[in-house]
Amino acid sequence: LVDAAHVAGLGIIMDWVPGHFIKNTDMLAQFDGTPTFEYTDPHRAENVRWGTWNFDLGKAQVQSFLISSAMYWLDHCHLDGLRVDAVSNMLYMDYDAGKENDRNRFGGRDNLEGIAFLKQLNTKVFAKHPDVLMMAEESSAYPKVSAPINTGGLGFNYKWNMGWMNDTLKFFEEDPVYRHSDMNLLTFSFMYMYNEQFVLPFSHDEVVHGKKSLMHKMPGDRYNQFANLRTMYVWQMTFPGKKLLFMGSEWGQFLEWRDWSELEWVDLKDPMNHKMQTFTKTLNHIYTNRPSLWQQDHEPLGTKITMADEPDVMSYIRYGKQKDDFTVVALNFVPVQKDHFRVPVPSLGTYTILLNTENLDFGGTWTKWQATLTARLGDHYGEPAWLDVILPAMGALLIVPKKLQPLPKKLATEHHQRPAA
């Protein structure tokens, strides 16, 4: 199956759970009548949060079993990577309920055996499979999760940005009337976006067990729910970090995910769901074909925040490595159109709108918009020029340069010396 996916151009990354296991007596629990894989101490063995047993990651047989498991999936099943589940549970002594006062032999809260195991795991994996992806689902502020081991890191390629995900969903679930006072939910992520190499996840965990689907989380009537969803996806696809979107979310499935049932494929007969799928497909193609949206995800020069202190709106610029390769992002988080909205840009010349979320083909109402935008000289939010645009209600624009012109010499020198935010 994995090989067939590879032929079709698909990579496969599997959810892998090395931190804890089920209590069934026909599985690993009390494997030989004694706590073989779990801790001997019942207090440390018990995982109250999930009703499972914690692996004793300090035991040689446990390390061998788990690393052999990982290598089996990579060696024999040809997986392209592993998403390591619940890493926080392996990093801390006091992560679980009832263990708030647990400490290691040095008096700290770090789980020394768990940290050593994760480093050993990544060392073994990359020694044999240097091109696979190892991703940590880790929700704390533990440092250097995605840094190399020889620099003090855990050695993962990427860390899931759970903070970005939680803040984003909290913001977009909110009635737009109140969003102006909660813009910090979005802007706070800019403060730590380079701390790790991040994945921005809208995963299965957020659309199950009564949490509702992404579509169902959105406020307003059906039209505005789709508009919110399109805008949120632009925010995700243009924010620094790799992207993850759970199946069914690409067309706005209304029911949350049920592991005993297939997706609501019938939704695609609805014009709005079909248009939502078209939008997601278009956004994906734009992302893959514009290096400025991904080439410098982890470099400060790759993102410049131009407007983040205004109520209800935001603007920033993503830069690629090539000269004049940049994408301007303008977002409107309320259902009120912004006429003559000034978008800061770094250069004079002409620009074009690459994506308008309110395009009729995507489920919006717009059939036409400004074909060419001409930048006007004048300092605006630290940029030397600005564009006069109509920013759609509850929508977003992606704007790209068409034909740029040099700035006046004095301005060019001044702005060349300004570091990217």
Which sequence ranges carry the predicted segments?
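Conserved, mostly hydrophobic/aromatic
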Residues: 5, 15, 66, 73, ...
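Structural preference for beta-strand elements that scaffold enzyme active sites
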Residues: 11-13, 80-83, 131-135, 197-199, ...
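Alpha-helix termination/capping residues and helix-transition junctions
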Residues: 75-78, 128, 238-239, 348
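Substrate-binding/active-site clefts of carbohydrate-active enzymes
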Residues: 1-110, 389
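Carbohydrate-interacting/catalytic domains
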Residues: 223-226, 237-245, 249-421
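Aromatic/acidic polysaccharide-binding cleft in carbohydrate-active enzymes
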Residues: 86-96, 100-101, 140, 145-159, ...
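Aromatic- and glycine-enriched glycan-recognition loops and surfaces
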Residues: 1-11, 60-65, 112-119, 224-227, ...
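Glycan-recognition surfaces
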Residues: 31-47, 108-226, 230-238, 281, ...
